[in-house]
Amino acid sequence: MPGTPQRAENAPELTAAQREVLAAQRADPENTTYNVGQYLDLRGPLDAGLLQEAVRRTLTEAPGLHLRFRGGEGRVLAEHAPFAPEAWRLHRLDTSGAADPVDSAIALVRDQLACPPRLDAPAAEADAPAAPLTGMVLVRVGERRHLLVQYFHRIAVDGYGVCLLTHRIAALYRAARRGDPPPACPFAPMRLLVEAERAYAGSAAEAADRAYWARHAAEPPRAALPRPRPAPDAHRIRRRTVRVAGAGAASLEAAVRGARVTWAEAVTAALAAQLYLENDGHEPVMRMYATARTAPGALRVPGAAVNVLPLRAPVRPGDSFRAVLARVAAEFRAARAHQLYRRPPGASGAPPSGVLLNLRPFDTSPDFGDVSARVVPLASGPVEDLSLSAVRDPGGGLRIDLDANGGVYGHEELAGLAARYAELLGRLCAQPDRPLSALAAPAP
């Protein structure tokens, strides 16, 4: 059985999100899906030395990233891991001579992401160095083109925290490139998240949120994926990517403006419509990541606070896409209003396995000055069934990743689902007032 996290004197107190990840990782030490990563596609006259200094300073300013956990006698001890800025170097690789330099670089990184993490060492190895929970590699893939690959363990930082770190690296690099002094550090300490959780526990706000989610779970939907499925394989995730650009992006933007919703709500509504149409009218079962950062200053903490919330996506016979958009947007607003509440482990009414939404409505386009930067996700976390991740491109397009559990979806099945989703999204956005049944793709 996993031990209970404890703290040494002056050691960090973990957030609820960190405790959840630690329990899951210790229950399955070989699970690599909590290793998450992305790369920045950097194009232009990059100064690798200045970038190294920007990354070094950022890692120094975020001590909450440097943790280790000691195991022994049924307990887990959280403690700070030493970080020596003067000895730290940004690893550099060059794949520019490969037949496909970008694919070669990504393959190297996927090998890193596929390594099972070692979060703790037994008591007999008390002096052993802790494996880092974060890492970055700069890969030259061509003339004036580099990939800054970032990988993290979810116990150290969540997706929003990664965005904070990336923007800080960009701000420091931009200032150094211009010859300006480093801008003041914007980060708030990790303890702010812990203190906010402590203040929330037992409060009237928590009671109101608990009551809301109890009502929400009183009438559980019929699952949108009713067919028998094999046991999930938590260690194998398949991916298919849908890109929305050009005329498709313009059509999506018009539909979003016309319905007064967000692009995140639009891509969710389209998937809800697809699952409804392809599963005999069963209501889609969804869950969504929420930042769970509502306390003052919480949005400045590069750490882990994310929560997973159930999301109803009801679709009714005769609905148009505009009607589904309005309903999904209302569900998003209600869920976010109660996003701090976490169900106790094993509590009744927990959301069943279904689609997990990993949307990034916050700004993910860092400004590196005279070097353009585009964020490309590589791995986004565990997937029990199906996950939809989306990130906005600097040019206004969308990258939508459909990740599937390898024990649930085969390659061809996922490829077909992604292709049908892309087609249906385009039709729905182009004709948002037509009944869904008139726009449905052919049955798979």
Residue ranges of model-derived segments:
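Short amphipathic alpha-helices and their capping loops
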Residues: M1-P29, Q52-A98, P132, H167, ...
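AMP-binding/adenylate-forming domain of the ANL superfamily
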Residues: A11-R26, V102-L108, V162-C163, L192, ...
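Acyl-thioester-dependent condensation/acyltransferase catalytic cores
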Residues: A23, Q52, L59-Q150, V157-D158, ...
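Extended, hydrophobic beta-loop-alpha segments that form or line the acyl/peptidyl-thioester binding
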Residues: A62, H66, H282-Y289, D319-F321, ...
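A short N-terminal helical cap/helix-turn-helix that marks the beginning
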Residues: R68-F69, Y173-A188, H216-A223, R333-A335, ...
